[in-house]
Design a protein with these regions (language model features):
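Short intrinsically disordered coil segments
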Residues: 25-30, 58-63, 137-140
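Hydrophobic/aromatic-lined pockets within catalytic cores
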Residues: 52, 97-100, 104-107, 122, ...
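Basic, alpha-helical interaction scaffolds
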Residues: 32-102
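Short, conserved micro-motifs composed of acidic
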Residues: 2-39
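Short, charged alpha-helical motifs in flexible N/C-terminal segments and linkers
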Residues: 1-12, 18, 110-141
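Surface-exposed helix-capping loop/turn segments at secondary-structure junctions
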Residues: 1-5, 75-82, 102-104, 129-132
Length: 141
């Protein structure tokens, strides 16, 4: 593998406590080019931070899903439920499931943020008050 010095970044992985105790700055170079040290990096659509907290990734994902939920709320006035589901499966569900096995170990607080958006999508598409939100989620699959 050949490294491209201008595109290469470095990241020091440690817990939050270790970063606070000794903020370490790496001074690395490759072929006389300084390698930039970063605290987070997007790779294949996943944002990895130097603490492996998944907070930046899930925050970004929630922002994207929220925008799409707004579009879904506007769309529901013009199309039937089957078209809403199509929009959900094309524009919301992939963000909830992409690489979920990687960031599955996130904190309960971050998981709750994603879950609340998922539940909001179910409520938007199925306003039937006789169904519980869990039943609506099961209906979505």
């Amino acid at each position: 593998m050949i490294l491209h010095p201008a595109k290469t970044k470095s990241m020091l992985l440690a817990t939050r406590q270790k970063h606070q105790l000794r903020p370490l700055i790496l001074n690395l170079s490759l072929k006389d080019n300084h390698i930039e040290q970063v605290h987070e990096h997007r790779h294949l659509g996943i944002i990895i931070d130097d603490e492996f907290s998944w907070r930046p990734h899930i925050t970004s994902t929630c922002k994207t899903i929220s925008k799409n939920l707004y579009l879904l709320s506007q769309l529901k006035h013009f199309v039937d439920t089957s078209k809403q589901k199509l929009f959900y499966y094309a524009h919301i569900s992939p963000h909830l499931t992409y690489a979920s096995t990687v960031w599955d170990g996130c904190s309960d607080i971050l998981f709750h943020k994603l879950n609340s958006l998922h539940r909001r999508a179910a409520k938007l598409m199925m306003p039937d008050l006789s169904l519980t939100t869990d039943a609506k989620l099961q209906h979505l699959g």
